[in-house]
From Swiss-Prot:
The active site is at residue 127. It catalyses: L-seryl-[protein] + ATP = O-phospho-L-seryl-[protein] + ADP + H(+); L-threonyl-[protein] + ATP = O-phospho-L-threonyl-[protein] + ADP + H(+). It comes from Mus musculus (Mouse). CDD domains: STKc_CDK1_CdkB_like. Interacts with CABLES1 and ATF1. Binding to CCNC/cyclin-C promotes RB1 phosphorylation. Binds to CABLES2. This is Cyclin-dependent kinase 3. PROSITE patterns: PROTEIN_KINASE_ATP, PROTEIN_KINASE_DOM, PROTEIN_KINASE_ST. The gene is Cdk3. Pfam families: Pkinase. The keyword Kinase applies.
């Protein structure tokens, strides 16, 4: 790692510290992510190194470029392209927190493009949130940390003991499902969509049960009628309070009918009925035309 000069610490992610760094030879600015795991005593598992190395093949305008992976001395370093701001900081710094609706539409389309691309390569994110959506200052939004959950799992707490946010976590994960699909990312995108529109987190829970109950209070407590199989999930309780569904008018009043319809499809309880990223991009909300990042994208592989 001698080729990189650390400029400053720019964040502490789920798995380790992130530095802004400069390549001493080329002058290129990069984000240097130093992975620190509980299992560092015995080093980074070779499976994780393999998983992460595969991510170098994911090339798309709406996915942060992984430039290199360096594994040495029981540590793993990931070298990413450098972007200056994330969506959370951007929303926090604007006077009202919510974004203009044309910007919301552009960002949502780009997120769906990036997620659709990853899903077509059988990569699930599992931990999408505004903090790992990065902005380039030119209108593009890019997904960071794709694939890390599969390599390392999603811990309950970060290595600095901060709680990993539950706000964007799909109900099937909260209900203890060990088998989940690309639909978990679609749920997260629905939560992020609503937050971009209103400037407020849709379901800001502070524990798993609080998170579930916030979802239930808004979307109604799920039943076998609305989500076949829900009563068989490991953490489902028949004693859950029975809340009825709120209207979307209360939740996202400024969103037009097409936007509300798309949000409902992103936040379907039953994962098998949740809209896919590819289908969402064809939704009437995005017509006529929407602003997207450039379409030239390549992949070094077609399956995992």
């Amino acid at each position: 790692m001698d080729v990189f000069q650390k400029v400053e610490k720019i964040g502490e992610g789920t798995y380790g510290v992130v530095y802004k760094a400069r390549n001493k030879v080329t002058g290129q600015l990069v984000a240097l992510k130093k992975i620190r795991l509980d299992l560092e005593a015995e080093g980074v598992p070779s499976t994780a190194v393999r998983e992460i190395s595969l991510l170098k093949e994911l090339k798309h305008p709406n996915i942060i470029k992984l430039l290199d992976v360096v594994h040495r001395e029981k540590k793993l370093y990931m070298v990413f392209e450098f972007l200056t701001q994330d969506l959370k900081r951007h929303m926090d710094s604007s006077p009202t927190s919510e974004l203009p609706l044309p910007v919301v539409k552009s960002y949502l389309a780009q997120l769906l493009e990036g997620v659709s691309f990853c899903h077509s390569h059988r990569v699930i994110h599992r931990d999408l949130k505004p903090q790992n959506l990065l902005l380039d200052g030119l209108g593009a939004i890019k997904l960071a940390d794709f694939g890390l959950a599969r390599a390392f799992g999603v811990p309950l707490r970060t290595y600095t003991h901060e709680v990993v946010t539950l706000w964007y976590r799909a109900p099937e994960i909260l209900l203890g499902s060990k088998f989940y699909s690309t639909a978990v990312d679609i749920w997260s995108i629905g939560c992020i969509f609503a937050e971009m529109v209103t400037g407020k987190a849709l379901f800001p829970g502070d524990s798993e049960i609080d998170q579930l109950f916030r979802i239930f209070r808004t979307l109604g407590t799920p039943s076998e009628a609305t989500w076949p199989g829900v009563s068989q999930m490991p953490d489902y309780q028949s004693s859950f309070p029975k809340w009825s569904r709120k209207g979307l008018e209360e939740i996202v009043p400024s969103l037009g009918p097409e936007g509300k319809d798309l949000l409902l499809r992103l936040l379907q309880y039953d994962p098998s009925q949740r809209i896919s990223a590819k289908t969402a991009l064809a939704h009437p909300y995005f017509s006529p035309g929407h602003s997207l990042a450039p379409q030239q994208c390549t992949a070094g592989r077609s399956s995992r």
